[in-house]
Amino acid sequence: MRKIISMLFAVTIVFGYISNASAKTLKCQTVLNPKADEVVMLKDFTDTVTTLTGGSLKFEIMPAGTVVGGKETLDAVDKGLIDCGFAWTHYWSGDHPAAMLFGSPVAGGGVGIDNLAFLSWFQYGGGKELYDRLWDEMGRDIKGFMLQPVGPE
């Protein structure tokens, strides 16, 4: 069963396939507090998904620490303890140095790659394939999706 995770340089969401066909609510733990702007935008996104699916797919968004600690979110999705996770990929740069490429792209102060160039590279220039390879090299059965690109800080 393939787990799907979304944790990119920005912030993204993670999904896991549900083995129970009658399940309609995905439990998604973030690495943030519930009032963070990113969580507000995540809830807007999941509300849109719920609307587009006619209510057949819903999300329970849980703050960091609800099921596992923030740093354990990736493992929890991989092991099926939660259905979704929401974080920045660079949280796992200690597990693989390439995670920083997706969590903190080279840019800033007019030097390097901006958000538009990063999104273009990710979608059409081989970035998505490298992102998949990152999780494979980390031994995770997951797949990433980008939801909220944020630029360099």
Functional labels for PLM-detected ranges:
Residues M1-I4:
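Positively charged n-region of N-terminal signal peptides that target proteins for export
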Residues V14-A23:
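Sec/Tat signal peptide C-region and signal peptidase I cleavage site
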Residues E60-M62, F145:
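General small-molecule cofactor/ligand-binding pocket signal
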